Swiss-Prot record:
This is Streptococcal hemoprotein receptor. Gene3D superfamilies: 2.60.40.1850, Ribonuclease Inhibitor (3.80.10.10). The gene is shr. The lineage of its organism: Bacteria, Bacillati, Bacillota, Bacilli, Lactobacillales. It comes from Streptococcus pyogenes serotype M1. It comes from the Bacteria. Residues 203-269 are annotated as: HID 2. One of its GO terms (cellular component) is plasma membrane.
Amino acid sequence: MKKISKCAFVAISALVLIQATQTVKSQEPLVQSQLVTTVALTQDNRLLVEEIGPYASQSAGKEYYKHIEKIIVDNDVYEKSLEGERTFDINYQGIKINADLIKDGKHELTIVNKKDGDILITFIKKGDKVTFISAQKLGTTDHQDSLKKDVLSDKTVPQNQGTQKVVKSGKNTANLSLITKLSQEDGAILFPEIDRYSDNKQIKALTQQITKVTVNGTVYKDLISDSVKDTNGWVSNMTGLHLGTKAFKDGENTIVISSKGFEDVTITVTKKDGQIHFVSAKQKQHVTAEDRQSTKLDVTTLEKAIKEADAIIAKESNKDAVKDLAEKLQVIKDSYKEIKDSKLLADTHRLLKDTIESYQAGEVSINNLTEGTYTLNFKANKENSEESSMLQGAFDKRAKLVVKADGTMEISMLNTALGQFLIDFSIESKGTYPAAVRKQVGQKDINGSYIRSEFTMPIDDLDKLHKGAVLVSAMGGQESDLNHYDKYTKLDMTFSKTVTKGWSGYQVETDDKEKGVGTERLEKVLVKLGKDLDGDGKLSKTELEQIRGELRLDHYELTDISLLKHAKNITELHLDGNQITEIPKELFSQMKQLRFLNLRSNHLTYLDKDTFKSNAQLRELYLSSNFIHSLEGGLFQSLHHLEQLDLSKNRIGRLCDNPFEGLSRLTSLGFAENSLEEIPEKALEPLTSLNFIDLSQNNLALLPKTIEKLRALSTIVASRNHITRIDNISFKNLPKLSVLDLSTNEISNLPNGIFKQNNQLTKLDFFNNLLTQVEESVFPDVETLNLDVKFNQIKSVSPKVRALIGQHKLTPQKHIAKLEASLDGEKIKYHQAFSLLDLYYWEQKTNSAIDKELVSVEEYQQLLQEKGSDTVSLLNDMQVDWSIVIQLQKKASNGQYVTVDEKLLSNDPKDDLTGEFSLKDPGTYRIRKALITKKFATQKEHIYLTSNDILVAKGPHSHQKDLVENGLRALNQKQLRDGIYYLNASMLKTDLASESMSNKAINHRVTLVVKKGVSYLEVEFRGIKVGKMLGYLGELSYFVDGYQRDLAGKPVGRTKKAEVVSYFTDVTGLPLADRYGKNYPKVLRMKLIEQAKKDGLVPLQVFVPIMDAISKGSGLQTVFMRLDWASLTTEKAKVVKETNNPQENSHLTSTDQLKGPQNRQQEKTPTSPPSAATGIANLTDLLAKKATGQSTQETSKTDDTDKAEKLKQLVRDHQTSIEGKTAKDTKTKKSDKKHRSNQQSNGEESSSRYHLIAGLSSFMIVALGFIIGRKTLFK
């Protein structure tokens, strides 16, 4: 394990402390809660609720924390903050509350959560120990206020005289807990809680339907959006309700708010010395018979469990096996309809479910296992500690255990988070750490990496404490440490004393199913966010139309968002971090006011050109980290107000001639990490307001010429391309240019005066290029330039240029390495004088502005002597992983070098200073070497070296090749006259052996047209059948002479688009169009390249839209057409009918062929989720609605005391058994703790190293939580 620097340790320790918790099990009766069952006190005096938080073991805990507003401890409000006495924080451990002001004694702690309901926790604190007493859920905000004395006063329900009791509407005044404050503005006041976009559906409905506002009897006017300053007017907007203060007087003031369907809200405020203060907010409450009926407990869930139990009993032939279940079920059936206590109802449901699960589970002791598969639970703590390890949250709570016939066991565990940082994992078995088999499962992220991994390994005695071992790059682990378990971070692992027979999958898989699929999942999310106004568990068109302002749907794993087409009043929409594969064409058509749209990190492959047609108000559009391969012409033409556009991290390999039409106000364009080889001449012309462009990490050989026309540009980033020169750009036309980043390219020359007139330049970055000299005449007349020319081929610079370099260093330079290539027969040999590792270490140790520059190899070697170690060891001490790639490259027709052979040195190797490659063909070659570094799962090429060029006139085996070429050249010797010829052709993959799928899409008899001595190929394409769908070629390009094949056999070089001779048409004769595209070419013509006359191979680039829709990125393919010159003839042979050809002509005869899978799916009616239970209505509303009528009859009641008592006794017995089991688990836990204590006494020597690593691990989890920003990080 690499050492951790003192500076890093100090910084980390300042943010995260490694603490152990002490938990004492309550000796008092435990009031069960589904979410909170324990509270602990950490050594840094923080109350810890570990069952709620982003990494909680239950999915409910992971969701609940998101909506916590504050915490109240004995009437003292605690706010979320890292500093202050009355504060709390939520991190990977759970909720941590500052306990500095909490004295010894009994306390009540309320977690305030308006969406999911408050939780009241009672506990006793004594010294450094906490005893948990109870936790009770108080209900959501809409329900809980009926339980609090300060919310609703007692209600009187008068009754009519007569034989039938009729409940009249009784009214009292009650305080409203959601309207509690105001803020004073200039000539106005604001009630922020009276919010038309409130998450509370009652407040939201009341605000949106306000009909009148009066202040001291003066009727106020709705000013819509005008200023209310010093007026008798009001405005309701996104910040709340604003009132002008013109009608306010000194002393008490009364504000009455009337709203359709609601009783009036009366707010009292006082004014003194110009200051206005909130006093109260009240509203009349009423109780009707209808209300009373609505308070009847919902037994739907219990009845569902009763049906489940009935089915089990009916199916079980061995009635003794279900005797206990049957007896308890009968008691519940006899009395559940008379339950009036919600707690008793919940306990009854739990009793029945526990009995069912006990029957189904068939729990088995870990000491009595037979052959089979089991479900196992585990606990992972930091080594020699009671505090949970990060592994507890990074792995699924369930583990799979397989017991084989010979008694040996194998355990499988699923890593669900931070997988990109986890290098390896193992659990000690029989005193050693077995190598685990890692299986990547589930979905991939945008970089092609799997999010989840399953680790499987042998394990022995489950009854003892096991040591776990993790190798994590974020904790200093390196790939070179793999299987060196002494360098792994250790943790303590214990397993449950019983296992469950069978295996139903990991918990995350169960959670995924519960979330629903398609629109059902989106609907569930919207319901959870409070957008279901009528409480029926569904989202109607009307409810969707009521969604206004900002809507955050990021990181919910959504796949289908078509439901949002009715949400026409959204102005800001966050959809990043989901799994959306397509955007329905009309999805945003009604969102006329949409100003912000974030679709980052989804699975989009294609956007229809009309997607944003109706969104003229859009200002910011983020489409990065998707799989988009191309941009439709006119896609953005309606976005006249767009200012920010990010298309980074996609698969865009080509642009149409005018992809940015209409974006005259765009100021920032992100296009990094795509596959662009060139940008069309006019593509950037509409971007007249652009001041920032990022083209980094593409395959550009030149900057686009039109960039010089964008006079507003201030920043150009084009690093990590293949740019060889910049003299095609007149930078003098960019007067505002401030930053130019061209680092890591292949620029060898800077023309004189190229930046002479760019007086606004503040930064020029040419790091890691091939510059041999830098003259003063290149730069403007400025004092400093922040010029970076490190890692070039520069031997010296003038004092003026040295001043422009500023705090950067000039050394090291690449020429120091002296990488040289030479031809030796049929081999190219290389030799290098100075290691890549030394160049890298030299740069790293002099990178800081305060570091002294080393200007010679001798000074660097002196540094090594002072360090007293070799370069490999020094880099390992810096926690760097690296590899070295050595490539043989050949020059292609486009001037770029293509790698045709390579060697990879991995696992922190020494540099290979000498070596050789075998040659295959004539051409221009060079050697390229690159150092690839990896830190914290981020890998990049840091520095490269190139040798001199080697010209090979004839390759090996040239005599044999000449014979082949001479045979093919006989075609030319015939001196073909102008005319039409025919020959056979087939389509091959780049391995030149396998048949390409496109082989089924061509007429295998191609036409050779000779015109004025120039040969052209004409190829007829056909429809290609994919399953039941029919697709067509979208575009065809061919590689010109001089192309080269890379290591994978893929051609690299310049391409030209083939000429379209004719298009496919439909039955009406119009150009064929379907959901994937239109104007599909049928016959195409291309010039026959000279190389094809020699080897019969024509390299092509084809794009098939339907293939890309089926599998992202698969639509654009490189293939070879193989020509059979032996079949050349002047007679057009009849085309043999092919059985796998889906269509013999260009006409479609069925409209079904035009329908894609989505069109057919849209014809089906989507299934809606079942309706939620009605729940309690007006009595528990924070805002009372007006009565719509009175009940005519009160339901008669019956009371069977014996049955109710029998049920209560059954519940009490069940709770007692649970408490007994809990006490036993506590005793076992104490025993394990004592065992660990004995181990700890023997492990003091490694303790300090452990705390160092543990501290770093805690910090990295916190930091990465912010970086990754995933709501479902540790699922």
